[in-house]
């Protein structure tokens, strides 16, 4: 018994479809983009949390990295705690923003999202010229 896709000459599996390479590349690029945004958010959250901790108790923050009787928490453990909270805020913030944009656009799949973004933003012109030859560009005259 043949599958439904075999009668038309098309593969039965969606992973073997001709456009699947482009879809997979799109998903990888999207993942890299979201990872970069998340990393930037984590860095911003870490810096913000660290600056708030320094503002709240600067004398404890500026003392050494060893915990003493006067300092119940070392600077490194304070920084790790700030990193943890900053990371949590960054991941939650990116998730909430992504979810809000997804719902505001009313899309149901990545293909819908891509077509919606292409309709909103202008197209990027492709350069038909070859890549810049740096040796010619940087050659002294």
Swiss-Prot record:
Major location category of this protein: mitochondrion
Keyword Transmembrane: yes
Pfam families from the UniProt entry: DUF1358
Entry's localization field: Mitochondrion inner membrane
Keywords tagged on the record: Acetylation, Membrane, Mitochondrion, Mitochondrion inner membrane, Transmembrane, Transmembrane helix
Keyword Transferase on entry: no
Membrane-spanning ranges: 30-50, 82-102
Any one Gene Ontology BP term: mitochondrial proton-transporting ATP synthase complex assembly
Bilayer disposition of the protein: Multi-pass membrane protein
InterPro entries reported for this sequence: TMEM242 (IPR009792)
Location of N-acetylmethionine modifications: 1
This protein's GO CC annotations: mitochondrial inner membrane; mitochondrion
Topological domain ranges for the Mitochondrial intermembrane compartment: 51-81
Subunit structure: Interacts with the core subunits NDUFAF1, ECSIT and ACAD9 of the MCIA complex. Interacts with ATP5MC3, NDUFC2, TMEM70, MT-ND2 and MT-ND3.
Family in the record: Belongs to the TMEM242 family.
Main function: Scaffold protein that participates in the c-ring assembly of mitochondrial ATP synthase (F(1)F(0) ATP synthase or complex V) by facilitating the membrane insertion and oligomer formation of the subunit c/ATP5MC3. Participates in the incorporation of the c-ring into vestigial complexes. Additionally influences the incorporation of subunits MT-ATP6, MT-ATP8, ATP5MJ, and ATP5MK in the ATP synthase.
Protein name stated in the entry: Transmembrane protein 242
Organism, as annotated: Homo sapiens
Lineage: Eukaryota, Metazoa, Chordata, Craniata, Vertebrata
């Amino acid at each position: 018994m043949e599958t439904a896709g075999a009668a038309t000459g098309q593969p039965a599996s969606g992973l073997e479809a001709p456009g699947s390479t482009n879809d997979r590349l799109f998903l990888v690029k999207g993942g890299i983009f979201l990872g970069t945004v998340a990393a930037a958010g984590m860095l911003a959250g870490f810096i913000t949390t660290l600056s708030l901790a320094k503002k709240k108790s600067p004398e404890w923050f500026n003392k050494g990295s060893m915990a003493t009787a006067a300092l119940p928490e070392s600077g490194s453990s304070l920084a790790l705690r700030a990193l943890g909270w900053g990371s949590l805020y960054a991941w939650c913030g990116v998730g909430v923003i992504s979810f809000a944009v997804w719902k505001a656009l009313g899309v149901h799949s990545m293909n819908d999202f891509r077509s919606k973004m292409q309709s909103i933003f202008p197209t990027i012109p492709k350069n038909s010229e070859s890549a810049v030859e740096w040796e010619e560009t940087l050659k002294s005259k």
